[in-house]
Amino acid sequence: MNFAHSEVATLDPNTMRTLCEEYVANNYIDPETSERLGVKRGLRNPDGTGVLAGLTNVCDVVGYKKDQEGHVIPTPGKLIYRGVNINEIVDEAYRNDRFVFEEVIWLLLFGSLPNREQLDDFCEILAEHRALPEGFMDTMNAPSPNIMNKLQRCVLGLYSYDEHAEDLSLENILSQSINLIASMPTMMVNAYQMKRRYYDKQSMFFHLPKPGQSTAEHILSTYRPDQKFTHEEAKLLDMCLLVHADHGGGNCSTFTARVLSSSGTDTYSAIAAAIGALKGPKHGGANLMVYRQLKDILKHVENPEDDDEVREYLRRILRKQAGDGSGLIYGMGHAVYTISDPREVILKQRARHLAYDKGFEEEYNMLCSIERLAPGIFAEEKGSTKPVCANVDLFSGLIYNMLGISEDIYTPLFAIARVPGWCAHRVEEVVFANRIIRPAYKYLGVRQKYKPIEER
């Protein structure tokens, strides 16, 4: 018998139809049962706020406050890294015209703002560890049509090159974290080049890391064929990395990293799992969906400056009569933020000049219209008074497109930015939590008596 296949073997459609019918006939959970039993689906309270599942010093996400009766009071959003409001970091970046993502990495990992000497030394360490281990290209040689899946495989592959992969000491986990933060941009670009060659039948090229470059500069330099980019482009990418670096312990991918870390597993397994969580369209994959929806709206709206026409098309999207049929306006709404998402506010402000300079004003203005019109449409269509604000995904896809970045690495860029946060939370979980995360599930199945196979 030959077990070799060029592709994953698929089961016969008729067989699968029968198996699915068998599953549906024997499995159902009524959503009302969850409410009756007080189950917090999605680890959410009835008012949409998250269930308190842990403590952290790494990051605070502020989108509301509660009054004495426990009612949610919407507030302008704030994102706090280790006690520092990210708006202060952004202001510093533009006031003194410097890259700040590396400073944020230090801040998230260690809890303090680095002085000049510490920052310079740390940037040098990152630069020295951007290159992949000798022989690692063998791992890269098996391409994937999805770069997120390839990133997972690459991260897991590093385990084989680490003599201390299972060492859970603080020193070793921090060392592994810094290595991952430094090398993942190189993995991403190389994985993209392999995908271009194998799946897209296009030329691929590999550029060696240049010393002295920031992470944003390194990405643009190794991604672009001619290695050329403007300072403004690199600064805008630096902003994208900064605002995506962490978002508290409860978001899906970070909580995934914490769950795996609580089991005592290795760093590579924990971060690979977080990448898998981020890939999902309900989490990190949303930035790609936003940009695809933007192109669809511009294709079907004759006059982008006509609010009534835009409003009507957005209404059709919500009714599942247009777009991808999901009924979602991507880039709108957030689990925590109510009035505003500070990350979206930053990217919207910083992207405007480049959008007009590069001829993307129509796309930029349409996103502004969506942000302005969508909340009212939500209220009309859903009958809800809950405030809805734009989220970070609304402008990030447009920014990547303005930078000439392929849709293939929109979400991988999110992963590159979020690795420092994942690692900071992993360290915190391993060092301080010291207990495996193990929530309860209530069994709803009906008791069956085992029957011999002859009696079935």
What are the functions of these language-model segments?
Residues 1-456:
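Non-transmembrane, aqueous-exposed alpha-helical and coiled segments at domain scale
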